[in-house]
């Protein structure tokens, strides 16, 4: 005899004796859910994307086209593992293009402006940054203006925007840098061992959201596979949340 427990559209099979053993113990709910987790590839309450969006939309208080979905990818690793960081260009973009600052002179400056950079210049740009509250989220430099960077190193460094050769943000090839910055979104692993990133608007169709989620999870796995060192880092759980709504564990491939 067995007890069939239905969770959403998923079903988990426990023997009748297992069910009774858990039911008669203290902390039944917590232990029962834990046992379900061990018998499944996903957390016990994991849902498909359509199931999750149904609940998230019903409890979110944001206007549909203003609120966003947030994906949280929990990583399985240890303290010796390097931190993961990368970029992704979503198949269905939904965020405003970032404001870009470029230190360059002459033809390189003209090219940067044509490509869509917000602030471009050399000595004049240094003065603006020192005296005006310019807002930008990306910063690059051409070698012909790199010597000016020490003058704004403290201001840019505190915002993690200081261009450097090591990070590839000082280059005589500005076109790929600017084009990538306008279409791709950066992500990085936080101190809690998770990667959190918006993946779409509440007005997205399930198909659009599903494709963005799959793209991000695949991108993160590719990034994890390239991490240096012998410590293996993998995806542990994936949760989807919305503006002012709870996080729901997702089934994922």
UniProtKB/Swiss-Prot annotation:
GO terms for molecular function: RNA binding; structural constituent of ribosome. It is found in: Mitochondrion. Keywords: Mitochondrion, Ribonucleoprotein, Ribosomal protein, Transit peptide. InterPro entries: Ribosomal_uL1, Ribosomal_uL1-like, Ribosomal_uL1/biogenesis, Ribosomal_uL1_3-a/b-sand, Ribosomal_uL1_mit. Transmembrane segments: none annotated. One of its GO terms (cellular component) is mitochondrial large ribosomal subunit. One of its GO terms (biological process) is mitochondrial translation. Residues 1-81 form a transit peptide. Belongs to the universal ribosomal protein uL1 family. Component of the mitochondrial ribosome (mitoribosome), a dedicated translation machinery responsible for the synthesis of mitochondrial genome-encoded proteins, including at least some of the essential transmembrane subunits of the mitochondrial respiratory chain. The mitoribosomes are attached to the mitochondrial inner membrane and translation products are cotranslationally integrated into the membrane. Component of the mitochondrial large ribosomal subunit (mt-LSU). Mature yeast 74S mitochondrial ribosomes consist of a small (37S) and a large (54S) subunit. The 37S small subunit contains a 15S ribosomal RNA (15S mt-rRNA) and at least 32 different proteins. The 54S large subunit contains a 21S rRNA (21S mt-rRNA) and at least 45 different proteins. NCBIfam families: rplA_mito. This is Large ribosomal subunit protein uL1m. It comes from Schizosaccharomyces pombe (strain 972 / ATCC 24843) (Fission yeast). The gene is mrpl1.
